[in-house]
Amino acid sequence: MNHMVEQNLGPVIGISVKDSERYCSIDEKNLLEEVAQDYCDQIIERGYRNVQLIGYSLGGLIALESARQLSEKGVNVVDLTLIDSMPVNYHFNTEVVLELIFITNLGITVEDLYNNVNNQDFKDFIALAYNEEKRTIDEEGILGVVDDRYAEVRSALSELISMSTEARFSSYSKVIKRVRNEEIRIEMLLDYYRIYKHNVNGSNITPMVYFGDIRLLHPIEPMEFVFLDTEGAEIIWDDICIGNLDVVEISGNHLSCIQNDKYVKELAEVIKKPIVDYLT
């Protein structure tokens, strides 16, 4: 956000979860709509009549719903930018797999937990365990995979499944300390995860069409551990967008595009373009 503030093109407001208990008490089926309503109320109360909305990953769906609601209330959405975002179209009926995806946001992966498991094998294993008919990933599917190529992955997941939640998060906390030299208390990790899980479950929707333009920013570097289908995302957003869908490539991968300072500076330049065009 600092790079955007330095551009001096208008107020820059970041919105995050302050009260996790209240946030997680919102019904998952209504999560996006209610959160977007809250965001819209704050924007309107501050008197903003022309806005740019930016949503990253799952936040893109909140940005989309906010854009829809603001447009209906007469606010001009100058630009809607989604950064590597798409709806979640499958269910996680096992905590372990979702936890292992969650910890990538904290800079560690299953490779850091188990030396004999690599991320690509984990992703391939999950593809085998995935129940396409039910669109679910569950423990039954994981334990039902019999393939010697992924014996280490199955063993690692079986071990994690057998552990208590507290024991798993204690392990994650220790690995974060070892790999990143960062201390995150187990209680805080659990709170972060609870919000993340709520976001994922709340994003398992088919969004209504949006009557406006969308910019979809796509990181050019693959990230083997993130379950994002780039081509599928473009198809989904093209169906949603009743307007112009502009797909723009940006530097980095799903995480580094917003964490690496060099990439973030480049991203800020990409983000500002429609605002500069609007102001001139």
Model-based region annotation:
Residues M1-T280:
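A hydrolase-biased, glycine/serine/histidine/acidic-enriched motif that marks catalytic-domain neighborhoods
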